[in-house]
Amino acid sequence: GAEYILAKDRKDWIYKCLKLNEKKDIEVEETLLGTDLVGIPYEPPFDFFKKHERPGKTWTVLSADYVTADSGTGLVHQSPGFGEDDYQTCVKNGIISKDGTDMNLPVDEAGRFTDEVPPYKGMHVKEADKDIKDDLKK
């Protein structure tokens, strides 16, 4: 079956979102601290940016002091082109350079996805939210 890594404090919310029954569908294999996950590689949910991969850097778990367990899964995706905290975390961890010239920006000036993200090309980022969520559930 599927394996998930999630914040213990968020398990009830996540189980509800995934329509899972804790007693019937869930087996907790291991309990870890967030710091235990730092440096572990993961498979990105979409492969749009594989050509930008930097082995040992991209798609590895990072640590950031602004990530909390009071909402979502307790894990945060980094988008350095769309937020100062993400940008600083990615620079600090060598994902992108400080000048940002190697940063991937798949959105145009109007806030629409470019051809780098084929299924959502031309869609405004907010219009694409539902489709992205649906695709993530698959």
For each of these PLM feature ranges, what is it?
Residues 1-138:
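Non-cofactor substrate-recognition interfaces
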